[in-house]
Every structure is written in structure tokens, then in C-alpha cells.
A protein has these predicted regions:
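A short, amphipathic beta-strand motif
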Residues: 1-6, 39, 101
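Beta-strand signatures of extracellular beta-sandwich domains
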Residues: 3, 25-27
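Structural motif
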Residues: 3-20, 106
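Short, acidic Ser/Thr/Gly-rich low-complexity loop/linker segments typical of extracellular
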Residues: 12-20, 27-40, 44
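Exposed beta-strand and adjacent loop surfaces of beta-rich binding modules
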Residues: 21-25, 48-50, 111
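Envelope-exposed proteins and targeting segments
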Residues: 22, 29, 97-99
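A short, solvent-exposed loop/turn motif at the edges and junctions
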Residues: 28, 42, 50-87
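N-terminal active-site segment of His-dependent metallophosphoesterases
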Residues: 83-85, 90-161
Length: 161
């Protein structure tokens, strides 16, 4: 349970004067629910869940210091199994009382440009550098692009990359 709300002051906390946003979809990866008139939603949360908001038009999710959108909450009270080859998720502890999603108002465009990469799969740091320096760096200067996205197999077999 939680709220999707207009975080007017962009402090990532639902203050008393900030109102919920109705009609926003939230999912647990299995089910999708819609927020009510107050921005409230209810959805089942297992002990291995990722709860996420589906960004509506004219709204933006917060971004972190790496410019990555913050639109989800991982709930794994015990974390990932210790016998995994790669680290996985640290224990998150008990489920919070509310899982709230702040959104910021923005003027959405009907038409926009985006850049999509499919399956870059570098297998070494040298290949990561090649991809960054010879491909991504060329696209940074492209005008009018709203966002970029990498899909599919992002790295080869070494997830530490």
C-alpha cells in the first residue's frame, strides 16, 4: 500500500500539503492496479517483489545522482541467496508501512526522439570503454533526444561490469 503523489518541493517525502495523483498505474510485476482519487493504491507484496510506478504522461520520476530514474521499490527482506555467483540484493528488512512514489509535473511531448541500444554485451572493461568512448560519446551531442535506453543483454557473462 502507498501513494503516488505530486512532490511539489521535490524532497522525496509526501508532505501534508502534497496531494495524491489519481489514475496512475502501479505494478508488482504480476498485477497492475490504479491509484484512487487520493493517489492511494493497494497491491500484494511478496518477499521477493519489485513494486514500481508506471510513469504517466506529463509526470516525471525523480532521478538519482547517476541520472537513473527512481520509480521502484525492491522488497527482499532476506536479500538474495548467498550462493549466487553475483551479489544480488542486500536484505531490505521489513516491508515499510507505505511505499510511496513521488512524481514531478512536466510538460510531456506528443512526439519525441529517443535512443535505444539493444544487446551491447561487452565482455571486458576494455569493451565497456570502447562502447562508451566510440558509440555513446558520439550520441551525447545528438540534439532533441529526450532519453536513452539499453535493452536486452546489457553485459556478457560478467555482471560485475
Amino acid at each position: 500500500m502507498g501513494y503516488v503523489y505530486n512532490d511539489v518541493n521535490e524532497n522525496l517525502s509526501m508532505d501534508k500539503n502534497e496531494i495524491g495523483i489519481s489514475g496512475v498505474y502501479v505494478s508488482n510485476g504480476v498485477e497492475i492496479v490504479k491509484t484512487d482519487k487520493d493517489g492511494k493504491y493497494k497491491i500484494p507484496v511478496s518477499d521477493d517483489a519489485i513494486i514500481f510506478v508506471i510513469k504517466p504522461r506529463n509526470w516525471m520520476t525523480p532521478i538519482n545522482n547517476l541520472n537513473l530514474p527512481q520509480f521502484y521499490y525492491i522488497h527482499k527482506p532476506n536479500g538474495s541467496p548467498s550462493n549466487f555467483t553475483f551479489k544480488g540484493v542486500d536484505p531490505t528488512g521489513p516491508l515499510p508501512r507505505n511505499i510511496n512514489f513521488p512524481l514531478y509535473a512536466e510538460n510531456g511531448k506528443s512526439n519525441f526522439k529517443m535512443i535505444v541500444f539493444g544487446d551491447p554485451q561487452p565482455y571486458s572493461l576494455e569493451e565497456v570503454d570502447f562502447f562508451s568512448e566510440n558509440i555513446v560519446s558520439e550520441l551525447v551531442a545528438v540534439k532533441g533526444v529526450e532519453f536513452g535506453m539499453t535493452m536486452g543483454d546489457i553485459v556478457g557473462d560478467n555482471l560485475d561490469l
